[in-house]
Amino acid sequence: MAAGFKTVEPLEYYRRFLKENCRPDGRELGEFRTTTVNIGSISTADGSALVKLGNTTVICGVKAEFAAPSTDAPDKGYVVPNVDLPPLCSSRFRSGPPGEEAQVASQFIADVIENSQIIQKEDLCISPGKLVWVLYCDLICLDYDGNILDACTFALLAALKNVQLPEVTINEETALAEVNLKKKSYLNIRTHPVATSFAVFDDTLLIVDPTGEEEHLATGTLTIVMDEEGKLCCLHKPGGSGLTGAKLQDCMSRAVTRHKEVKKLMDEVIKSMKPK
């Protein structure tokens, strides 16, 4: 009977749970799904990570290549993110050129990289005006069940922390790049941005880490990105119902708490990988 009611009146079905301060999957309104991260998942990439947020699964692979710097920024490299939402992750997506949601997610990740200064572009310079690194960050969703932005941000950060670049010098006689694969170093990750997403129900009720179904039924969504100092790096609100100042402040304080949880989880995984 409950399954039939959910099919016919999905929003009313959800409201009955929300009135009791819980959700159909058993979580409280402010409770996140189980989050896991696996670092170094792709052996052919220069850095990679697999993140699971409940059922939502995103893998990020980073590939480093040489490039010529732009004339207006001769000492800066590039970080190029791309989010792919293929049909295999959900029946809502079609094959072909990137859909609107994938484009929005790619732009969101690009904004996070730029605003948080996670990597100083100058750190990617090999020889000013001649040669820089370009980091291609490909994020692929393997299973879509809502809150793709949180999963992508976490996967990107974890993958970048896994990247090791070889030492590169320019031979003065030949002007060619010489790569020393035996001498590698990790990227200098300057900040640790973490995204926290919320769904708004009936213009007033806030829930964290929405599933795909909850996003579909919500009257609005909001994603806040904070760094370890509690600074706001990014705020993404694609239309929908408005929020009061008090509600927004509540979201930001929850985002600070979530940052600590995610950072702790990632630090533990990285520590467990290091040779004893």
From Swiss-Prot:
Residue positions, PTM N-acetylalanine: A2
Protein name (record): Exosome complex component RRP43
InterPro entries membership: ExoRNase_PH_dom1 (IPR001247), ExoRNase_PH_dom2 (IPR015847), ExoRNase_PH_dom2_sf (IPR036345), Exosome_comp_Rrp42_subfam (IPR050590), PNPase/RNase_PH_dom_sf (IPR027408), Ribosomal_Su5_D2-typ_SF (IPR020568), Rrp43 (IPR033196)
Species, as recorded: Homo sapiens
This protein's UniProt keywords: Acetylation, Cytoplasm, Disease variant, Exosome, Neurodegeneration, Nucleus, RNA-binding, rRNA processing
Stated role: Non-catalytic component of the RNA exosome complex which has 3'->5' exoribonuclease activity and participates in a multitude of cellular RNA processing and degradation events. In the nucleus, the RNA exosome complex is involved in proper maturation of stable RNA species such as rRNA, snRNA and snoRNA, in the elimination of RNA processing by-products and non-coding 'pervasive' transcripts, such as antisense RNA species and promoter-upstream transcripts (PROMPTs), and of mRNAs with processing defects, thereby limiting or excluding their export to the cytoplasm.
MF-aspect GO terms: identical protein binding; mRNA 3'-UTR AU-rich region binding
One GO biological process term: nuclear polyadenylation-dependent rRNA catabolic process
Assembly with partners or alone: Component of the RNA exosome core complex (Exo-9), composed of EXOSC1, EXOSC2, EXOSC3, EXOSC4, EXOSC5, EXOSC6, EXOSC7, EXOSC8 and EXOSC9; within the complex interacts with EXOSC5 and EXOSC6. The catalytically inactive RNA exosome core complex (Exo-9) associates with the catalytic subunit EXOSC10/RRP6. Exo-9 may associate with DIS3 to form the nucleolar exosome complex, or DIS3L to form the cytoplasmic exosome complex. Exo-9 is formed by a hexameric base ring consisting of the heterodimers EXOSC4-EXOSC9, EXOSC5-EXOSC8 and EXOSC6-EXOSC7, and a cap ring consisting of EXOSC1, EXOSC2 and EXOSC3.
Location in the cell: Cytoplasm; Nucleus; Nucleus, Nucleolus
Gene for this chain: EXOSC8
Pfam families: RNase_PH, RNase_PH_C
GO cellular component, one term: nucleoplasm
Disease connection: Pontocerebellar hypoplasia 1C: A severe autosomal recessive neurodegenerative disease characterized by cerebellar and corpus callosum hypoplasia, abnormal myelination of the central nervous system, and spinal motor neuron disease. Affected individuals manifest failure to thrive, severe muscle weakness, spasticity and psychomotor retardation. Vision and hearing are impaired.
Annotated family: Belongs to the RNase PH family.
